[in-house]
Amino acid sequence: MREKVVSLAQDLIRRPSISPNDEGCQQIIAERLEKLGFQIEWMPFNDTLNLWAKHGTSEPVIAFAGHTDVVPTGDENQWSSPPFSAEIIDGMLYGRGAADMKGSLAAMIVAAEEYVKANPNHKGTIALLITSDEEAAAKDGTIRVVETLMARDEKITYCMVGEPSSAKNLGDVVKNGRRGSITGNLYIKGIQGHVAYPHLAENPIHKAAPFLQELTTYQWDKGNEFFPPTSLQIANIHAGTGSNNVIPAELYIQFNLRYCTEVTDEIIKQKVAEMLEKHNLKYRIEWNLSGKPFLTKPGKLLDSITSAIEETIGITPKAETGGGTSDGRFIALMGAEVVEFGPLNSTIHKVNECVSIEDLGKCGEIYHKMLVNLLDS
């Protein structure tokens, strides 16, 4: 299986699919799946290409989810080999997207192919949801496919997202949930004036200082058995004209919360508004909710992937919910059990992104055994 996975991964990496461009990756995948009897449905939205492919018509519906888009390479001169050449050096496959996530995407596809070849009349449905809009805006990708499927009352029972979840060794971590993410863009009004005449102006930085102290020290919750406590970080602050003798007219503050299931986005918005009113600030705030938290509790999917990893590698993975957001947050809206598993994430988005070809082969075996555990038991 390893040779098949690596070969497909190389084919995908050689296509420079900087988000939201697909560069023909999904066409390669669709042609392979169509030969095995998968129903292929294209779902393009604006500049994003999405693929929904499925084999079978009954439940349970087991979906593999992934993305063909990648982040920019950075300075290509710093790479040890061209980032889209997909070279193998000392057992490592190099290239942008090798770990995030064309390698695991290839492993999922080969696993599905091998299972269908051996079980053409399998029970349930095997599906693949693939997008070219995960790394950037994430507006016309998985979320639009999910909305389309929900409008048609289509179900996903279990979903494996191939994000690189492993930390130090393949299979040491699977993600069974993610924190929510919400960003506040806050504008605090002042009155511009000369710094020598502060009584004729109103400095929004000075006015906001007590509020910022409260905002950054407030304990939102204590977390729970599945999630760490909610955290807030200020990402950007800007005020002033650049001159040292002008009191600014406005202060801009951008902050982000990664929040757990102990709070909601509405609770966060309400509490921030209460703080702003308490400190008597003139303000305008715009909120951007990137995703709500989701959690897959121990059950059939988590048991199946855990067992597959144990059988293949001999280690028991730890289920975690840390890290950033993923497209799993959208699929969870369908009521599906969602788990993420993939190769090591130590080089993702970096120069010389790479993945072990041995690990890619093991990923394929693990995904295949997961299918066996879910459909043959």
Swiss-Prot record:
Enzyme class: hydrolase
Signal sequence, renumbered to the chain: none
Name the record gives this protein: Succinyl-diaminopimelate desuccinylase
Reactions performed catalytically: N-succinyl-(2S,6S)-2,6-diaminopimelate + H2O = (2S,6S)-2,6-diaminopimelate + succinate
Subunit structure of this chain's protein: Homodimer.
GO biological processes: diaminopimelate biosynthetic process; L-arginine biosynthetic process; lysine biosynthetic process via diaminopimelate
Positions annotated to bind Zn(2+) 1: 67, 100, 163
Superkingdom classification of source: Bacteria
